[in-house]
Each structure stands twice: as C-alpha cells, then as structure tokens.
Regions:
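Intrinsically disordered, low-complexity, charged/polar segments
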Residues: 40-76
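Basic/aromatic-rich interaction segments and small domains that mediate binding to polyanionic partners
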Residues: 13-49
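Short coil-to-beta transition motif at edge beta-strands of beta-rich domains
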Residues: 1-14
Length: 76
C-alpha cells in the first residue's frame, strides 16, 4: 500500500526529466499522490499505478517530514 512517508526510486527516468533526481517521497495520498523530489520539486495528482509499476520502494518512515530528512533521501 502506498502511503505518506515512503521513499521511492523511479526505475527509469522519463526523457523529459533526465536532469532531475529519480528519488522522491510520498507526502500525501488520496485518490492520487503528492510527491516531493530531492531538489524540492513537488508534483501533485500523480497516479498510484505509475508508482506501483515503475518505482521501487526504498524505505518507509512514519511521516513524510522524517522521510525527507532521512539519510536514504538526502544521500541517495
């Protein structure tokens, strides 16, 4: 189950985002997800199907705030 506080890594970056990080944190989840990338970029309304199929769960924290301050997120 996808939930806030999880850190994911995209398996493959889309061609339009080759310069950005492929590590992100789930900050909220409802019908869609809101995610935060290492550079601070926030994407809203992300489909959970994409996360399930094209991303790998790295680590899980109780809150998204703990996740963005974690070693796994900062040092990856």
């Amino acid at each position: 189950m996808i939930k806030a506080g999880q850190i994911y890594k995209e398996k493959e970056l889309p061609y339009w985002r080759k310069h950005e990080s492929n590590i992100f944190v789930i900050s909220s989840i409802d019908y869609t997800a809101c995610i935060i990338y290492k550079d601070g970029t926030v994407d809203r309304d992300i489909g959970t199907k994409w996360i399930k199929e094209d991303c790998k769960l790295i680590k899980e924290y109780p809150t998204w705030q703990e996740a963005v301050n974690s070693k796994e997120f900062r040092d990856e």
